[in-house]
Amino acid sequence: PMPNKTQSQTAELEKPTRVRYKVAVLTVFLAMITYLDRVCIATLAPNIMAEFTLTKVQMGYVFSAFALAYAVFEIPTARYADRIGTRAILARIVIWWSVFTMATGMAFNFVSLLVARFLFGAGEAGAWPSVARTFGRWVPKKERGTLQSFFFSAAFLAGALTPVIVTWLLGIISWRIVFILFGCSGLVWALIWSLWFRNEP
């Protein structure tokens, strides 16, 4: 029997293209950027605490601000990605959190640092759900598990290497410039993503 229109459309959506490899590379780089930006503050905390004369409790609030925002905004951002597509949402949220990564380096007291990290967490919250949706559109089911493993491994590798990178950078530049430098990496990624990626194969 001849396939109906719905079957043909489904087959076309499931037909893999080589472009998915480029999507995979971009998302793996994004995984690394997410952990680079979120983990770096742990190594930079002593420098920040010394400059602002913060207590350990205050620094704990700064860490918690990120986690709270991440928890609150993850589901709403994922729903937004389902509605408008991941091309727009990932570009926007990566720009958002990159700006607030840089804003962390421009903080001038405890409150400004707290706000910057909260808004940074709000941006990062939607990254992984949006990437999962991207995989669902671009990657065949039989390859998604493998790609997810690369994605997670890249994130955790970046998390492991970030303290080493940050320690080395602190010998050259200030803690403030480290945040600005890391924020710029996200802006570059967002530009490439928004210019190249499309929501559907």
Language-model region placement:
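Extracytoplasmic
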Residues: 22-56
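Residue-level signature of mid-helix packing/kink "hotspots" within the transmembrane helices
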Residues: 39, 67-75, 125, 159-160
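Cytosolic juxtamembrane N-terminal segment immediately preceding the first transmembrane helix
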Residues: 2-36
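Helix-breaking motifs and short loop linkers at transmembrane-helix boundaries and internal kinks
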Residues: 53, 85, 106-112, 123, ...
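Helix-loop-helix hairpin linking two adjacent transmembrane segments in secondary transporters
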Residues: 151-200
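Cytoplasmic helix-loop-helix junction between adjacent transmembrane helices
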Residues: 116-155
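Conserved MFS/SLC helix-loop-helix module at the cytosolic interface between two early adjacent transmembrane helices
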Residues: 72-111
